[in-house]
Amino acid sequence: MKFTFVLSVVGLAGVAALLAMPAVAGPDEAEQRGVAASCVKVVDGDTIVVKCDKRQMTIELAGVDAPELGQPWGKAVRSFVREMVEGRALEVRIIEAGDGSGTARVLVAGQDLSRLLAERGLAWATAGGELQDLTEKAKSAPCGLWLDAQPVPPWEFRGEGAA
């Protein structure tokens, strides 16, 4: 009983330390560590709420910007993400963390969810990001949202500058 309690406390401390990792930690260092999680809710195509050791955290998928729910493809992308993550074990690799939220790579069965979204034309890669080539390939194919004549980037829909 004592041994189990000690392991639980040590495990919780490890998860807390990972989630509290400062935003200044470099992606190489942060992405090497992952924590097991499950999905609590899919907010939209690039935002999910996960649970790690009884703690919930809102995660923005790193490297992509998916259509907002009020845009064409927004609900379809959310449905795709829901199908990918609900009821499945996730590995969350924190890149930046704040209080109860963060940016992360999310792996499902070893597959990077951000990468899948970019490959299938379901999200824009962030400008200059490593997934930019995948977005360009999807656009050339065309597939996903690139089947539309002039898809509106989500940052324009929100009235912001480029992602």
Predicted regions and their residues:
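Small beta-barrel nucleic-acid-binding modules, primarily SNase/OB-fold domains
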Residues: 2-163
